């Protein structure tokens, strides 16, 4: 009989009694990890002090790398190696003060057998809350139980009690009483429209173009064809290298025409001459070529929406994609002709763009675009990061702040929009944003996500509000002043309810001219999704019936 050398299976260590193990998922980009490490270190120290005060020991699951200058897990491979050294049944806390790539720790968390808590610091300095929400959405999609908790420094009673509960029971449940299922809808014009558009989509189909899938480890942002196809939505898988190749075919003259159009529309470009730290005309020229190239490729493939990964694939190749993305999402935008000059592409309409190839946003943007257009509303839509927030004048006002672009109509027009160089920490080749302060008004917010093996959508109402200029600037300085900001007040949803429920780092927003119209649009959107077979959840205070 043949004898084979069998592998020696790894035996994880036993958990130490009354001990919590911690891990920290980070960025792939070394500059981001090094820059953010001091803030992460402070959060870990604050958390350790709280855990110790509650009578537990804390053991960090991986060492700080003095050569790299940080203590983050910075790749999927590194994460797998770290989890080999951790007791499988130990209580585990994922500590995040930064934007992190969920796939760095997903393999380990998926097979971990002990309770998992994801914590973040309540701060806008770096996107730790955004990182927490992305990991929460990814674990939800993976079907892995977990708990979440957030605090400024873990000295407050609310956070300490939450930590105590999790340490003693292995679970922590927050109030999500603001969420309820969709009741039967009345037979009105909005319901009829939503149902009709859903049936049209399912029957006639739509194509979303994906320029490289899986941006920045966002497992939650990948929706498999098996979930999309029953809605009538199909993917055209495209390569970012093809986008760069098409950019090279765009003439300088065509790109300059885009710049001239934007200058005439009143947009401000904050330019300089230092390529390493400032926005330059050369960077802008490249971005306008990307805008033209994206529309031409979309026309080639008959796309109904498009997403560009950018990070990581293009960040070392061309300037940021954000300016092109913001232009694509707006109705009024620089005209782009077919290669032979015979046709204007997607004339008089946006080409919905889903930032960071977030396919939950793709579905949502496609639905919103068709519905808002049919209702005669501005179909410009965008996603935002749920970055942070604080009370102002007796109301909790969220900072919704996507990393680079919104449609100009959300700012009140191009004359109220501006472009600044993207932060070098994330964008080594620069490129400009399409930024501004979102105009006050009524919005519908939403999020499509995967849970329990099927598609769900949360729908809610909010108001974009105006804050004094000094408060706006304070919030921008507390986060990323280069990026577009929306001051948002959710209707009937508290800060902690929203954090406990939301299953993604992103949410979608679209404007309506007044509250009554926004309520009608939400009702039609609920009917649209329900007819598609997506499970609809209503969040907060809504005027659902006419």
PLM region descriptions:
Residues 15-29, 55-59, 123-254:
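Cap/lid and interdomain-hinge subdomains that line or gate substrate/regulatory clefts
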Residues 29-62:
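Low-complexity, highly charged intrinsically disordered N-terminal segments
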Residues 75-90, 110, 292-300:
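Short, well-structured alpha-helical segments in soluble
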Residues 3-24, 32-45, 97-99, 114-122, ...:
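Anaerobic metallocofactor- and corrinoid-dependent redox/one-carbon enzyme cores
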Residues 54-85, 245-255:
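N-terminal beta-loop-helix "entrance" segment that forms/cooperates
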Residues 86-92, 153, 178-185, 190, ...:
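Extended, charge-rich low-complexity interaction segments
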Residues 29-31, 67-70, 101-104, 125-126, ...:
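Flexible loop/turn segments at secondary-structure boundaries
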